[in-house]
Amino acid sequence: MIFKDVGVIGYAEALRIQEQLVAEVQQGGEEALLLLEHLPVYTIGAGGDRGNVLDPELEPVRVNRGGDVTYHGPGQLVCYPILDLSRRGRDLHRYLRFLERFLVELCAGLGVGCHTVPGRTGVWTGNGKLASIGVGVRRWVSMHGFALNVSPDTAPFSRINPCGMPGCSITSLSLELGEELFVDELKEMVAIRFQPLLNLHLPR
């Protein structure tokens, strides 16, 4: 698996890189994990409800992923796994549950207890939503992925119903731990832990 850290990047450029990697995996290339922070941007999934955008001046980017409207910005670790799911079971639901499990175990390693919510995709603590998940698939190659709140400014979330959930509180690892964490620290943890857990739960 290729691990590609592209730093802080605009959404359009990240999408271009994803599409390039997807094409390479479709042609038999190595799977990849894209690690980054986005410049501030709001995105909305293909089936998302525009009514969940509370600020009438806000124009979210419509993207080919599941889920509703969300915010990405500095202080949030975004990971886009580019995986050949045709060789990992062809089960999108199982893949989503794997991403949730990975996030729960990753956060537990930092001393943050979190959980999933039946009927919802993502990860929560008792204080609010900690990570969002939205994926897309092209010919069984995955794109998009998850966003983990490490230490972002949570104020921009007030302009939307995050993930289509009115009144949804947003938390972060830094808020949960009472100390500032940095995205680069989490990138190292993800790079170490992602592939072994992936091969355990979604073996090729």
Swiss-Prot record:
Location of the protein in the cell: Cytoplasm
Binding site for substrate: 65-72, 132-134, 145-147
Disulfide bonds: none
Entry-linked InterPro entries: aa-tRNA-synth_II/BPL/LPL, BPL_LPL_catalytic, Octanoyltransferase, Octanoyltransferase_CS
Sorted UniProt keywords: Acyltransferase, Cytoplasm, Transferase
Enzyme Commission number(s) from the entry: 2.3.1.181
Chief site of localization: cytoplasm
Pathway: Protein modification; protein lipoylation via endogenous pathway; protein N(6)-(lipoyl)lysine from octanoyl-[acyl-carrier-protein]: step 1/2
Active-site residue list: 163 (acyl-thioester intermediate)
Domain BPL/LPL catalytic stretches: 27-202
One GO CC term on file: cytoplasm
Reactions catalysed: octanoyl-[ACP] + L-lysyl-[protein] = N(6)-octanoyl-L-lysyl-[protein] + holo-[ACP] + H(+)
NCBIfam families: lipB, PRK14345.1
Protein's name in the database: Octanoyltransferase
Species annotation: Citrifermentans bemidjiense (strain ATCC BAA-1014 / DSM 16622 / JCM 12645 / Bem) (Geobacter bemidjiensis)
